[in-house]
UniProtKB/Swiss-Prot annotation:
It comes from the Eukaryota. In neuromuscular preparation of crustaceans, the toxin increased neurotransmitter release, causing repetitive firing of the axons. May affect sodium channels (Nav). One of its GO terms (molecular function) is sodium channel regulator activity. Keywords: Cleavage on pair of basic residues, Disulfide bond, Ion channel impairing toxin, Nematocyst, Neurotoxin, Secreted, Signal, Toxin, Voltage-gated sodium channel impairing toxin. One of its GO terms (cellular component) is extracellular region. This is Delta-hormotoxin-Cpt1b. Residues 21-31 form a propeptide. Residues 1-20 form the signal peptide. Its main location: secreted. Pfam families: Toxin_4. InterPro entries: Myo_ane_neurotoxin_sf.
Amino acid sequence: MKTQVLALFVLCVLFCLAESRTTLNKRNDIEKRIECKCEGDAPDLSHMTGTVYFSCKGGDGSWSKCNTYTAVADCCHQA
């Protein structure tokens, strides 16, 4: 009985890890695929301006959101 419970637990953990990896890959694909524009400027990859992120980086106010694609994907630019 304990072996069966342990096997079921391991299967659940493996499923969760696989699902997390799939979700991460989908997010990375969106970041690579979507180019956004902030204030009419074309994307500037050297400063990551116009790149879609799932949250604008920098709690210090160095990044700000200029457009929203979905509830979780934002177009960000350096302030």
